[in-house]
Amino acid sequence: MTEPLIRFENLYKVYGSDPRSVMPLVREGHSKDEILAETGHTLGLRDINLEIEKGQIFVIMGLSGSGQSTLVRHLNRLIDPTEGAIYVGGIDVMNLSQTELEDFRCHRMSMVFQRFGLLPHRTVLENVAFGLSIQKIAKAEREEKAREWLRSVGLDGYEDQYPSQLSGGQQQRVGLARALCTDPEILLMDEPFSSLDRLIRSGMQDLLVELQDKLHKTIVFITHDLDEALRLGHQIAILKDGVLSQVGRPEEILRNSADDYVEAFVRDVNRARGLSTITNP
């Protein structure tokens, strides 16, 4: 059996002044609200065990505050867990030195943000090439690669524009090109299309599917939109208050909801239409 590329084991995250002191209550099953009321600490994640296969688009869903962004930010250690282990390609991410962690972030993964995260004082070309400049790639080489990625996302000819001159959809294309320009193994996408109008959003989904068919990256994708999750995901994980409610293929989520919380997500979906939108077999 193939080893998963990403593995979370018994992952817990508690926010507050003394998170470890709260762990006995967490293990006893106290709710998020109870822990906050009793200790002033906030439960972010509770006992997450999750595997993500290489080459998948893995979608993470949940209501706001359910822990999706917290979970994803553990992968590159923008957030460290209170307890638990994180493995990427067999490497224990928690054991990386600061130098190793910086190299890991530079070369193994990239992020695409909801609010684009572009540098306003740099041109489109400079924004796309930014990650390569951090890697100290020669200017001519990084600009050549940046131009290639701009062509790939349909922005050939926009190299000398500035982010403020672009539409929201165009800015997110720049963000996607920038993330891919460093050739990362893993792409972390935190609600990347949620601020776009529906038509532009659909076009960005099409572009992502088209690029993924060619590149076969491992993509961890956060969304609140079930239609988007069904269209993009090989697997979907649904979180509630930092706990995994269900993990499964899109059709499993639609047909066999694990609990009332998951059922609430799929209740208003036309199931026949939802099944027909599933892109990934």
Task: Please identify what each model-predicted range represents.
Residues 247-248, 256:
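ABC ATPase "signature
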